[in-house]
């Protein structure tokens, strides 16, 4: 299965995390599945991991953050998506995530973000063969 996780899921995949997103990364990395990422997702994940709230939660050093990003790159196929038209009306910053899934021919966009579950976004994804799932839903299906 070809999977694009959004930034929040990628953040929760770090080595100090123990929830479903971390287990999802392990299944994808060591299974027949494919992780699809973009420079946008990698840069945003790195930036978010430095936020004070994330630092309080995970206490990742700069080296550990770099290792997390490098680890993601080592198991992912990187695509450079082109954002063609707005898809996520409530948060246009989410459009690069959608187009990473489209251009990477993903089957699943993994997210907990409500904006991705809006009917118009779901329909756009469906037209491109993409299902929107939470990390827990995706874990159950793998």
Regions found by a protein language model. Give the residues of each.
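A generic structural signal for short hydrophobic patches within well-formed alpha-helices
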Residues: 10, 42, 54, 116-117, ...
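PIN-domain endoribonuclease scaffold, especially VapC-family toxins
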Residues: 27-83
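Short secondary-structure boundary segments
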Residues: 7, 39-40, 112-114
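Short, well-structured N-terminal submotif of metal-dependent ribonuclease cores
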Residues: 1-37
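Hydrophobic/aromatic ligand-binding patch that stacks against planar heteroaromatic rings
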Residues: 27, 100, 124
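Active-site neighborhoods of divalent-metal-dependent phosphate/nucleic-acid chemistry enzymes
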Residues: 74-108, 120
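Residues at secondary-structure transition points
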Residues: 19, 36, 63, 88, ...
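Acidic, PIN/NYN-like endoribonuclease modules and their adjacent C-terminal/linker elements
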Residues: 104-108, 114-142
């Amino acid at each position: 299965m070809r999977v694009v996780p959004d930034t929040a899921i990628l953040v929760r995949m770090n080595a100090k995390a123990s929830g479903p997103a971390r287990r999802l990364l392990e299944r994808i990395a060591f299974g027949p599945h494919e992780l699809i990422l973009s420079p946008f997702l990698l840069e945003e994940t790195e930036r978010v991991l430095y936020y004070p709230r994330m630092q309080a939660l995970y206490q990742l050093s700069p080296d550990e953050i770099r290792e997390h990003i490098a680890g993601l790159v080592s198991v992912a196929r990187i695509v450079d998506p082109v954002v063609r038209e707005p898809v996520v009306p409530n948060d246009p910053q989410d459009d690069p995530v959608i187009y990473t899934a489209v251009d990477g021919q993903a089957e699943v966009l993994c997210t907990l973000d409500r904006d991705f579950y809006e009917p118009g976004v779901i329909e756009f994804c469906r037209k491109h063969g993409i299902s929107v799932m939470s990390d827990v839903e995706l874990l159950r299906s793998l």
